[in-house]
Amino acid sequence: MEKIRLHLGIDKWTIFAGSFGTALALVYAIHYLQRVKRMILQGIFLATESDLKWFFQEGISEIYPAEFKKFKDFIPKEEQNNLLEAYHKRFFCDNIELRNKAIKIWSRFQLRVMESENIMIPEDGEIQASEISLALIEAHYFYNNMFWEDKNYILNRVEKIKNIPIYIAHGRFDLNTRVISAYKLVERLNKCEFIIVEGAGHSPFTEKMSKVLIKFLEDIKELNYKDEENR
């Protein structure tokens, strides 16, 4: 992100991120505080051990038991105590056929737990290139603890960014990234507008969620105009 900022010649910018991107955006702000003007974040993901366990081992399995069973049963029983490790192993093996089967199961599982939000699930045919790239990136980072020094990296360093104006929207029924993560983050921020969007889930494209995000953008546009006038 910093290389992109430098390439574009931007002094300070507003960062808009969702889901996995919120973790990346928050870490960027922690390291490049002086370059972040404001932030809009949707579906807070802190990438903690608890977050990963909830989605890939237990937690969401109690809400989508049939979908999770398919995700779990692809892995031999002797490896089911650590599904993230088992999928990571298959994603980066030399057997391309096995890799693609594993990625398809992984990807379709994630889509199915968002099914109530009218998410389009690809046919059970060829795996999509976007599914491969996303799965490999996710597994690589999740399995390696995001390459962070500790397992609660963001919250342990959020003090550094507590005075950045941050706008956060999180769906009440977001099962991919839980509301509790947003709540823990917001408790540590001084300049935060936090909206729990009732009836919304993880997708930014539903009517209720997009309405909130558009309002955030309009608010920031007005603030940017005022900043220009005061120069």
Model-derived segments and spans:
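Conserved acidic catalytic loop of the alpha/beta-hydrolase fold
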Residues: 1-13
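Conserved hydrolase catalytic core segment
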Residues: 11-50
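A catalytic-pocket lid/entrance helix-loop region that shapes and gates access to the active site
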Residues: 34-86, 212
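Small-residue-rich helix-loop
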Residues: 121-132, 158
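Active-site nucleophile elbow and catalytic-triad environment of alpha/beta-hydrolase enzymes
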Residues: 140-158
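Short beta-strand/loop motif that positions the catalytic acidic residue
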Residues: 161-162, 168-170
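Conserved alpha/beta-hydrolase "acid-adjacent" motif
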Residues: 175-181
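Catalytic active-site module of serine/aspartate enzymes centered on a nucleophile-bearing elbow/loop
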Residues: 192-231
